[in-house]
From Swiss-Prot:
Signal peptide start-end: 1-26
Domain of life, source organism: Bacteria
Protein name according to UniProt: Glutathione-binding protein GsiB
Subcellular location: Periplasm
Gene assigned in the entry: gsiB
Source species: Escherichia coli O157:H7
Name of one Pfam family that matches: SBP_bac_5
Length: 512
């Protein structure tokens, strides 16, 4: 009898194991290998695109941007703007719940915009919302937002990934810890966040769009090494990987189970120079460094051809971008300018990077070698997200150790103000925003401010051109390249792609 029971138990165990294996196989679980870690899951307090991209798992905004960076309605149904450009009235969708069961309504919008526009909260994205004078809940589905002054790009601010609707109940419950406890209206809710290893999100059963999401879970896994990221895709450890190491693109393209995608981008890579510090306060030094870098060679060496040399300080696909004659590679001219500037034997400096993945390392090494050829000794440091937040984003001009800084920017609003003001306006030095050159020019400030007060395209073109002309001439940057976005995914994964600003779109993602 005992032997018979034992056999029955084995059979039952075998059936149970088979069923569990079947269920596990049937579960639609996707692993996404990304290039760096996340700083926070509070979109209003994140300066990096990746953290905001992952936060889209939980959160949605009133508006969003599609693949072509065109405005689309999300939690809002429509909007109107007053003739004076001061008041925006937004009509909301009805019947939407936050993941904690509370209602999304006009009061929730007010709570979020009040928080975002209050400087006392010290949120990293405050500058996006500082022009809001007040937000009113007219009725449960109507919000009126009054600005301090006309701001023609404001609707694009509401479409920015930072402008997420967080549950007011969660804001009250978690306070400053909301970055660890995301609660939104999005398709997924938080399962686990291991801060050194991964963020796992699971399907939100109460999501308001019928039939979505189609995946059961997404695990966002930071993998700094490019080759490891590609290998995870080939072994099936990951179903989506971005960025793909450019040198491995051709190899992955040959894999019958993998689809490679090279997408258009608004991601500009550049090196800022701290113009408040010697020797970068000398325009001739900045000009010399621009001549010292062979951009076409950089495209080949670090990006395997998946980039184009920069022809301005705003990527060409952004409205009102101006293009200029690219800086030629001329090390002889660079040495002449350094001599004229009082540095005939060059100088020593530091070159930091905002990322530590393999492509960033290649850019650092290439730039270090190029600078050495004109007598400049650059000590390079590739930072992770935590180092960047502490040493670059968190320190003002007097405390900052930034000298040369390799980084990138994508104007996630899809318009020119967000491509220029955060990076060049005098009021946007760190820790306020990302003007890591500590650049300041009153004319540029005035042109950028005036451009926000007009809706006339011709006048905006004139003003943005004038600002870019000055910036290009004064050269607080070494503009390098505009990237192409190379990602890869398992062929059985659909509806998962990279946005031009390097964010992710995955609302319709499915695993066949």
């Amino acid at each position: 009898m005992a032997r018979a029971v034992h056999r029955s138990g084995l059979v039952a165990l075998g059936i149970a194991t088979a069923l569990m294996a079947s269920c596990a196989f049937a579960a639609k679980d996707v692993v996404v290998a990304v290039g760096s870690n996340f700083t926070t899951l509070d979109p209003y307090d994140a300066n990096d695109t990746l953290s905001q991209a992952v936060a889209k798992s939980f959160y949605q905004g009133l508006f969003g941007l599609d693949k072509e960076m065109k405005l689309k309605n999300v939690l809002a149904e429509s909007y109107t703007v007053s003739d004076d450009g001061i008041t925006y009235t937004v009509k909301l969708r009805e019947g939407i719940k936050f993941q904690d069961g509370t209602d999304f309504n006009a009061a929730a919008v007010k709570a979020n915009l009040d928080r975002a526009s209050d400087p006392a909260n010290h949120l990293k994205r405050y500058n996006l919302y500082k022009n809001i004078a007040k937000t009113e809940a007219i009725d449960p589905t109507t919000v009126k937002i009054t600005l301090k002054q006309p701001f023609s790009a404001f609707i694009n601010i509401l479409a920015h990934p930072a402008t997420a609707m967080i549950s007011p109940a969660a804001l009250e419950k978690y306070g400053k810890e909301i970055g660890f406890h995301p609660v939104g209206t999005g398709p997924y809710e938080l399962d686990t966040w291991n801060q050194t290893d991964f963020v796992k999100v699971k399907k939100f059963a109460g999501y308001w769009q019928p039939g979505l999401p189609k995946l059961d879970s997404i695990t966002w896994r930071p993998v700094a090494d490019n080759n490891t990221r590609a290998a995870m895709l080939q072994t099936g450890e990951a179903q989506f990987a971005f960025p793909i190491p450019y040198e491995q693109a051709a190899l992955l393209e040959k894999n019958k189970n993998i689809e490679l995608m090279a997408s258009p981008s608004i991601m500009q890579r550049y090196i800022s120079m701290n113009v408040t510090q010697k020797p970068f306060d000398n325009p001739k030094v900045r000009e010399a460094l621009n001549y010292a870098i062979n951009r076409p060679a950089l495209v080949k060496v670090a990006f395997a051809g998946y980039a184009t040399p920069a022809t301005g300080v705003v990527p060409p696909s952004i409205a009102y971008a101006q293009s200029y004659k690219p800086w030629p590679y001329d090390p002889v001219k660079a040495r002449e300018l350094l001599k004229e500037a009082g540095y005939p034997n060059g100088f020593s400096t530091t070159l930091w990077s905002s990322h530590n993945h393999s492509t960033a390392q290649k850019v650092l090494q290439f730039t270090q070698q190029q600078l050495a050829q004109v007598g400049i000794k650059a000590q390079v440091t590739a930072m992770d997200a935590g180092q960047r937040a502490a040493e670059v984003e968190g320190k003002g001009q007097k405390e900052s150790g930034v000298r040369m800084f390799y980084t990138g920017w994508s104007a996630s609003t899809g318009e020119a103000d967000w491509a220029l003001s955060p990076l060049f306006a005098s009021q946007n030095w760190p820790p306020t925003l990302f003007n890591t050159a500590f650049y300041s020019n009153k004319q540029v400030d005035d042109f950028l401010a005036q451009a926000l007060k007009t809706n006339d395209p011709a006048e905006k073109t004139r003003l943005y051109k004038a600002a870019q002309d000055i910036i290009w001439q004064e050269s607080p940057w070494i503009p390098l390249v505009v990237e192409k976005l190379v990602s890869a995914h398992s062929k059985n994964l659909t509806g998962f792609w990279i946005m031009p600003d390097t964010g992710f779109s995955f609302e319709d993602a499915d695993l066949q």
